[in-house]
């Protein structure tokens, strides 16, 4: 499910390093990559929040389930970045209705 979309003026590939540096300062288990698309995964036990451009030209904040793990990531990102937080999470095309 998609919970929010980040807003920034530059191409996502130019924004990746800034986003990654910020996330690393606030979360201990982070995986990332930039090759064609940008992704940052924040891992906490069994929970994972993805911030990626796999289906968008801007970074989307995603997780299979809603919960405190998603809220924590959104609240942390809002400290520095502009986000459009969806009132109701949106399903991705590959997710069952």
Feature map (PLM): residue ranges:
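Terminal, regulation- and interaction-focused segments at domain boundaries
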Residues: 1-14
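Short, intrinsically disordered low-complexity segments
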Residues: 13-68
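Short proline/glycine- and acidic-rich turn/helix-capping motifs at secondary-structure junctions
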Residues: 36-45, 87-97
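Short amphipathic beta-strand/extended segments with alternating polar/hydrophobic composition
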Residues: 50-53, 72-75, 96
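Short, compact, well-ordered microdomains
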Residues: 64-92
């Amino acid at each position: 499910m998609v919970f929010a979309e980040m807003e920034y003026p530059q191409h996502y590939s130019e924004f990746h390093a800034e986003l990654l540096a910020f996330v690393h300062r606030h979360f201990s288990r982070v995986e990332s990559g930039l090759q064609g698309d940008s992704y940052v995964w924040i891992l906490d036990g069994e929970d994972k929040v993805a911030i990626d451009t796999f289906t968008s030209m801007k970074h989307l904040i995603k997780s299979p389930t809603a919960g405190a793990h998603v809220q924590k990531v959104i609240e942390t990102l809002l400290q520095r970045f502009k986000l459009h937080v969806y009132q109701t999470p949106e399903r991705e095309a590959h997710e069952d209705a």
